[in-house]
């Protein structure tokens, strides 16, 4: 083998490894974005359920708080809570929506469904 051919083969092997590493990093990134989305859903669902079920907490006590870190706790001291006021929508997802690639990915999946 000539030196040029050896150099070419070494670069080719390095490129293959780099592409494999990139795919693994993209998979890890996608998994992290999905985990963020799932945690947001869990947070909003937990707060929504506690606000309206009348039961919450680890000891089954009644929950009287209302709100979350996104919308605030303005109704904290009010005794009547409106389900419509505390229901969350996708616009509340400040963490997962901050990733342009995740938004594009979700938009592409919804068009394919």
From Swiss-Prot:
Coiled-coil annotated residue ranges, if any: 1-43
Record-level GO BP terms: chromatin remodeling; DNA repair; DNA-templated transcription
Keywords from the named record: Chromatin regulator, Coiled coil, DNA damage, DNA repair, Nucleus, Transcription, Transcription regulation
Region feature (Disordered): 36-64
InterPro entries associated with the record: Eaf6
Protein's UniProt keywords contain Metal-binding: no
An example Gene Ontology CC term for this record: NuA3a histone acetyltransferase complex
Cell compartment(s), UniProt: Nucleus
Extra facts: Present with 504 molecules/cell in log phase SD medium.
Family label: Belongs to the EAF6 family.
Protein purpose: Component of the NuA4 histone acetyltransferase complex which is involved in transcriptional activation of selected genes principally by acetylation of nucleosomal histone H4 and H2A. The NuA4 complex is also involved in DNA repair. Component of the NuA3 histone acetyltransferase complex. The NuA3 HAT complex has 2 functionally distinct forms. NuA3a binds H3K4me3, through the PHD finger of YNG1, and acetylates H3K14 at the promoter region of actively transcribed genes to promote transcription initiation.
Assembly notes: Component of the NuA4 histone acetyltransferase complex composed of at least ACT1, ARP4, YAF9, VID21, SWC4, EAF3, EAF5, EAF6, EAF7, EPL1, ESA1, TRA1 and YNG2. Component of the NuA3 histone acetyltransferase (HAT) complex. The NuA3 HAT complex has 2 functionally distinct forms that participate in transcription. The NuA3b HAT complex contains an additional subunit, PDP3.
Protein's name in the database: Chromatin modification-related protein EAF6
Taxonomic source organism: Saccharomyces cerevisiae (strain ATCC 204508 / S288c)
Gene from which the chain derives: EAF6
